[in-house]
Amino acid sequence: GGKFFLIQIASLLLYQSNNLIIAHVSGNTDVAVYNIAYKYAGIFQMIFSLIIAPIWVAARDAYIHDDISWIRGIMKKLNIIWIFFVLGSLLQLMLSQFAYDLWIGKSLNVSFYITALCFVYFILNMKAGIYNNIINGTGKVKLQFIMYFIQVVIHIPFAILLGKIWGIEGVLVS
């Protein structure tokens, strides 16, 4: 329970630190640009998260009953579903400027590059979500706990450094 709590705190630090860092290195307007691209790119992840959410409990049951073949099978199916989400995300990325024009008009300029970086983040995050749900289901969260801790320790200084060099894009690359 305590490790799950600390993982959630680390997630919060990872996800929310970008807003503060972008505001510091690039300005509040870029925070708005980042948030628009982030929200737009995150649409498919929201849907994907709904699909994989029940896997946590199912993986727990399979693990308790030593049904490793079920776990392997569901991972294979989820990876195939993930490919379709990647393709959908790429289509959504190609339509991003049109969507921004409808959504926010010409009030802000959200570059294709910033949007693409957000999509890369969410595509990788969806992939990691498959494995995180399986790991959580087995109750073996030590590796996930260590990885989140390392991510926080590395991400924040690199986001500040790269943000000072490349602006919002540097924060996203970090």
Regions found by a protein language model. Give the residues of each.
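Transmembrane helical elements of multi-pass membrane transporters/channels
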Residues: G1-V57, Y121, N125-G129
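Membrane-water interface at loop-to-transmembrane-helix junctions
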Residues: G1-F4, Q8, S69-F85, V110-A116, ...
